[in-house]
């Protein structure tokens, strides 16, 4: 995919490869201008990695681009069409409040989507106003950057700009636009959309484009579309295992929110688990617990089955044989997920080698944590540093019994105790974006226009494995509440 434009003073270096797909996949339009754009947070390090001049982005002209008031030379804004199963129900969807401005080609030749979220109505808006509120946009900025620092594949946030306009949800709220950066915004739902149009030519065009963009090493494969499915399964198995290992709950794992690239996308109702419980749900709209913490691997494979269904015409000319190929391929998700999860959990427990009983040891710890309502993140920190033993959980007979088995397990490997502790330090974060801390930062920013709380939180979250003293205050768990924490989509 060759780049088509010259580099501009700000560093914008655009290509529009997605716009070369069949026109059914998008609608071209310009972002709706806003009254009084103001930059409230810019990700300087991300800007630099994209080949952009951070200071130029802070200028009046730079902010105008981030707010959608100016379209840079070489950009060709478009809203993407896609479909999706939302809580199990199929719908034709699309970018209802976002525009892909263009694709930035970095100095190293990498390609990233630059998307404005909250940029106005599109042909896919349905009853929405196409705008976004400041709180949810800042929330996505905080959590996506925390996920990046944790080493979890994710879309990223370049900037949040206020619009000088109000939007109306339950109440009047300040409007904002998030500049999101992604390897691409191709989703499982994009393939569902292509399949729903019943155009094999369009489906093939999308698959070929996706392979060229994300998996060029399989272009010459004997069965490239099967290889594409296998690649996505592998990436999603790895991604969801990483979610589970840090206690991340996505909250809205619809098929339109599962990327082909393997990046986490859409941070609307997500949250991190405090007390360990597999049935934990934070999303206010997930009334049945479909997307609960413990369900995420199962929803992942369900979503991937929908991708496989969409690809059937490309897998084999005989539909029954295609279905069998898809089924055999999807069945590999479970073992792949378990492989990644076990490897990650071994690292969290300081274990270097493999033993057949490792899974049993891990599940015994988790079951004891659930019984005593132990904090997920802090339990692993306590094991890492041998601290915080004065609680019912650590005093319990069940934990004492497990701890003895764990020490015996560590003794059966060649690596030293200090090596095990270093492995644990490198895999057990000192800090996660705890819900009450995120809410504190958002309240100060939205209600008081005070961004200092958020800036301190972002600084602490930027190096979660540093285990520095300034991170300790963020390790405290929230006070017990009669009202469970709830998250909202922000739409």
From Swiss-Prot:
Q: What residues bind ATP, as annotated?
A: 94, 96-97, 117, 129-130, 180, 187, 266
> What GO molecular function annotation could you give as one example from this UniProt entry?
magnesium ion binding
| A Pfam family that the UniProt record links to this protein | SelO
Q: Which domain of life is it from?
A: Bacteria
**In its keyword annotation, does this UniProt entry include Nucleotide-binding?**
yes
The family database entries (InterPro entries) matched by this protein are listed as: SelO
Keywords, ordered alphabetically = ATP-binding, Magnesium, Manganese, Metal-binding, Nucleotide-binding, Nucleotidyltransferase, Transferase
The cofactors required by this protein are:
Mg(2+); Mn(2+)
Q: What does this protein do?
A: Nucleotidyltransferase involved in the post-translational modification of proteins. It can catalyze the addition of adenosine monophosphate (AMP) or uridine monophosphate (UMP) to a protein, resulting in modifications known as AMPylation and UMPylation.
The record's section on HAMAP family has: YdiU_SelO
* Similarity annotation: Belongs to the SELO family.
Protein name from the UniProt record? Protein nucleotidyltransferase YdiU
Q: Tell me the organism.
A: Bacillus cytotoxicus (strain DSM 22905 / CIP 110041 / 391-98 / NVH 391-98)
């Amino acid at each position: 995919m060759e780049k088509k434009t010259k580099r501009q003073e700000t560093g914008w270096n655009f290509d529009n490869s997605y716009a070369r797909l069949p026109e059914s996949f998008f609608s071209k339009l310009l972002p709706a201008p806003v009254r009084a754009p103001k930059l409230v947070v810019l990700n300087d390090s991300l800007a630099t990695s994209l080949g952009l001049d951070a200071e130029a982005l802070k200028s009046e002209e730079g902010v105008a681009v981030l707010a959608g008031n100016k379209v840079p030379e070489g950009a060709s804004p478009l809203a993407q069409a896609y479909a999706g199963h939302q809580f199990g129900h199929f719908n034709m969807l699309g970018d209802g409040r976002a525009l892909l401005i263009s694709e930035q080609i970095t100095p190293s030749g990498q390609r990233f989507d630059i998307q404005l979220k909250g940029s106005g109505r599109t042909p896919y808006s349905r009853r929405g106003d196409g705008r976004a509120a400041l709180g949810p946009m800042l929330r996505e900025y905080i959590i996506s950057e925390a996920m990046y620092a944790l080493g979890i594949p994710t879309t990223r946030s370049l900037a949040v700009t206020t619009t000088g306009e109000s939007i109306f949800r339950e109440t009047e709220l300040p409007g904002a636009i998030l500049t999101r950066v992604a390897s691409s915004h191709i989703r499982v739902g994009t393939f569902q959309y292509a399949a729903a149009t019943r155009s094999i030519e369009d489906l093939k065009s999308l698959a070929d484009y996706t392979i060229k963009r994300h998996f060029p090493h399989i272009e010459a494969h004997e069965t490239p579309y099967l290889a594409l499915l296998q690649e996505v399964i592998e990436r999603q198995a790895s991604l969801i295992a990483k979610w589970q290992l840090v206690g991340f709950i996505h909250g809205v794992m619809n098929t339109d929110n599962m990327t082909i690239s393997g990046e986490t996308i859409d941070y609307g109702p997500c949250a991190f688990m405090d007390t360990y419980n597999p049935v934990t749900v934070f999303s206010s709209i997930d009334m049945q617990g479909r997307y609960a913490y413990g369900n995420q691997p199962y929803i992942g494979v369900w979503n991937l089955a929908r991708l496989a269904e969409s690809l059937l015409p490309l897998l084999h000319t005989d539909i029954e044989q295609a279905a069998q190929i898809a089924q055999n391929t999807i069945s590999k998700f479970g073992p792949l997920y378990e492989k990644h999860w076990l490897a990650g959990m071994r690292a969290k427990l300081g274990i270097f080698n493999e033993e057949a009983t490792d899974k049993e040891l891990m599940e015994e710890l988790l079951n004891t944590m659930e019984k005593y309502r132990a904090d997920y993140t802090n339990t692993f920190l306590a094991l890492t540093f041998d601290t915080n033993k004065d609680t019912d959980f650590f005093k319990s007979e069940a934990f004492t019994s497990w701890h003895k088995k764990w020490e015996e397990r560590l003794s059966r490997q060649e690596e030293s105790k200090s090596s095990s502790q270093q492995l644990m330090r490198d895999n057990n974060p000192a800090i996660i974006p705890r819900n009450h801390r995120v809410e504190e930062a958002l309240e100060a920013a939205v209600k008081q226009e005070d961004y200092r709380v958020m800036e301190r939180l972002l600084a602490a979250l930027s190096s979660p494995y540093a285990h520095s003293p300034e991170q300790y205050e963020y390790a405290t768990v929230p006070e017990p509440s009669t009202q469970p924490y709830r998250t909202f989509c922000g739409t």
